[in-house]
Amino acid sequence: MNANPKFLSADAHVDAAAVAPLPNSRKVYVTGSQPDIRVPMREITQADTPTGFGGEKNPPIYVYDTSGPYTDPDAKIDIRAGLPALRQRWIEARGDTEVLDGLSSGYGRERAADPATADLRFPGLHRNPRRAQAGKNVTQMHYARQGIITPEMEYIAIRENQRRAEYLENLKASGPNGAKLAAMMGRQHPGQAFGAAAFGANALAEITPEFVRDEVARGRAIIPANINHPESEPMIIGRNFLVKINANIGNSAVTSSIGEEVDKMTWAIRWGGDTVMDLSTGKHIHETREWIIRNSPVPIGTVPIYQALEKVNGKAEDLTWEIFRDTLIEQAEQGVDYFTIHAGVRLQYVPLTANRMTGIVSRGGSIMAKWCLAHHKESFLYEHFEEICEIMKAYDVSFSLGDGLRPGSIYDANDEAQLGELKTLGELTQIAWKHDVQVMIEGPGHVPMQLIKENMDLQLDWCKEAPFYTLGPLTTDIAPGYDHITSGIGAAMIGWFGTAMLCYVTPKEHLGLPNKDDVKEGIITYKLAAHAADLAKGHPGAQVRDNALSKARFEFRWEDQFNIGLDPDKAREFHDETLPKDSAKVAHFCSMCGPHFCSMKITQDVREFAAQQGVSETEALQKGMEVKAVEFVKTGAEIYHRQ
């Protein structure tokens, strides 16, 4: 499908729904050690506790915000100009890059000179790409191993802490019961972190820039931050940090336009997508990607073999190292932050898939398997891996080593092909680390619950704790249309066991290309799974939001319940289906139980009765039961009464 002309006209814009602030929320910025380290967070305002429940102040809570400038009313959003180059000064100040005279990729130059693409191109880029100076390495891992704390690392430390300390201090200062309130709202259940370094007996009270540097230096975390994507807001992927989620977007040969993909990106980050992968396989892949990157505040990943295949008209056997290499450079100079590269699909593993129920289900894996069989040679990705590393470190592109032999059904889970490839990915990780190139490892797939932990344990062992990035896994194969749920179950589990980033699955998985509604559904499901994993691991401060929402629920602060939740719009919509009037927003019940059977209202009544009688809640319950017993006998001791 050709690009939508309306999107590319002078009035091109993102839809208003993607840029409006979320209810009762505002963008706030926390400044670091220098003025241009301004870390965004979402502040959610809360109402005071009603007088009947104590009348105390409830200070705002702060949550991680991936939406970039889009939800900041003070920001001027023009997708034809792109986002501000947030990291440009930091990159320049390091003095180890050079601005190129033009594009290095032959295909990139061809597209730039093609008059047929003139009306499709992103018009707002007025700078040439950068590359490392000769002999220099510009990866965040390289800096970390030199003992350097970069502005990106400081930014991340501030971001991961989510102003938790300030929130608790505000609680303490909120009134006479402030200290008690802070202790209650800061309380968190101990987690089980399966050996993760940041948790347990010596858990960090807060994430520090030095801790970020150390985790990146060890290879346990990555900061995907291509020097040609200065618009990105630094983030980190590692099991000692908040579990992140990725959203896949991208056109296909039969549907979607450039405009729709940009809208999907802004929609995905609004609801919490930490990274976005552009998996476009249709027309104008190069131009689509440029629009997305220039307007994205989150890291962008791709699978370069998809575009390379388009360059040879879809014939896998016609792929060459030279075409693939040019594609890597083309995308690196556009600013792609991480590449999925299926270098672990080796010739010797392909026959191991013959007895599978569903064979090879990875598109990238099947492309490389077909090439290996057609030439009866080892994959050129494997053979040229060191050369790929040289490209990656010249732009600071991170590896996402692809699981091309992942199981496509629970029948095939943890088989010889899958685990053989995983072991190879561990070997390739060591090669990449020799070049100080950042690496994460992709994982399955379809795995029943009882086999999930084995996947995590083997990955940690064979890949030396490089971050794991998994698609789900889907825990059953019986629910087309609901695979965001079948996979969300597995995602929560594997996130708890140590996976650093979860790739979302939408309700359209296995059925079709997701639209914006599907993207939101997938994002919310996976934010839920990631948060559940953070709670289970005992991540510092993970329970703050739960505690705030629970307190609002108990105090019947309906608007706060909606707004603190992951999807305020849906929560409000569901409530208003049965109780649409404004008066219902202050009622001490909902339509589930009604006014007489609300457990929380009954508890409040017990507390009020106890206060009036000057006794404890336990004594109040006992006294109340005694009163009711006498009343029961006086009315005839009948269980049922005729009306």
Curated annotation (Swiss-Prot):
One of its GO terms (biological process) is thiamine biosynthetic process. Its cofactor is [4Fe-4S] cluster. Pathway: Cofactor biosynthesis; thiamine diphosphate biosynthesis. It comes from the Bacteria. Binds 1 [4Fe-4S] cluster per subunit. The cluster is coordinated with 3 cysteines and an exchangeable S-adenosyl-L-methionine. InterPro entries: ThiC (IPR037509), ThiC-associated_dom (IPR025747), ThiC/Bza_core_dom (IPR038521), ThiC/BzaA/B (IPR002817). One of its GO terms (cellular component) is cytosol. The keyword S-adenosyl-L-methionine applies. Its EC number is 4.1.99.17. [4Fe-4S] cluster binds at residues 590, 593, 598. Keywords: 4Fe-4S, Iron, Iron-sulfur, Lyase, Metal-binding, S-adenosyl-L-methionine, Thiamine biosynthesis, Zinc. One of its GO terms (molecular function) is zinc ion binding. Zn(2+) binds at residues 446, 510. The keyword Nucleotide-binding does not apply. It catalyses: 5-amino-1-(5-phospho-beta-D-ribosyl)imidazole + S-adenosyl-L-methionine = 4-amino-2-methyl-5-(phosphooxymethyl)pyrimidine + CO + 5'-deoxyadenosine + formate + L-methionine + 3 H(+). Substrate binds at residues 248, 277, 306, 342, 362-364, 403-406, 442, 469. Belongs to the ThiC family. Homodimer. Catalyzes the synthesis of the hydroxymethylpyrimidine phosphate (HMP-P) moiety of thiamine from aminoimidazole ribotide (AIR) in a radical S-adenosyl-L-methionine (SAM)-dependent reaction. This is Phosphomethylpyrimidine synthase. The gene is thiC.
